[in-house]
């Protein structure tokens, strides 16, 4: 009877060891995925920052052109 119990216990221990090994592999895969996603997020944030800077530059240029046009329109009104 005790041999049978030991065999059952051994099987359960082996199953637990196998489960732990599988979970460790899954954790490693998730860590790699997390690292890739973090890198992608950083790249996206950098790209977003560049786009925001370009948009601000375009707004500044537009404001400058509008000011110049208003100045020219003002001079045209003075001439009339």
Swiss-Prot record:
- Coiled coil (UniProt feature): 3-80
Q: Where is the composition biased (Basic and acidic residues)?
A: 49-62
- Chain residue ranges for the region called Disordered: 41-62
Q: Which GO terms describe its cellular component?
A: cytoplasm
Tell me where it resides.
Cytoplasm
InterPro entries registered for this protein in UniProt: Cell_div_ZapB
Q: Which domain of life is it from?
A: Bacteria
Record GO biological process: division septum assembly; FtsZ-dependent cytokinesis
Kindly state which keywords UniProt assigns to this record, in alphabetical order: Cell cycle, Cell division, Coiled coil, Cytoplasm, Septation
Functional summary from the UniProt entry: Non-essential, abundant cell division factor that is required for proper Z-ring formation. It is recruited early to the divisome by direct interaction with FtsZ, stimulating Z-ring assembly and thereby promoting cell division earlier in the cell cycle. Its recruitment to the Z-ring requires functional FtsA or ZipA.
Q: Which HAMAP family match?
A: ZapB
Q: Which family does it belong to?
A: Belongs to the ZapB family.
Task: Share what the entry says about its subunit structure, partners included.
Answer: Homodimer. The ends of the coiled-coil dimer bind to each other, forming polymers. Interacts with FtsZ.
Q: What is this protein called?
A: Cell division protein ZapB
Source taxonomy? Bacteria, Pseudomonadati, Pseudomonadota, Gammaproteobacteria, Vibrionales
Gene name, Swiss-Prot/TrEMBL: zapB
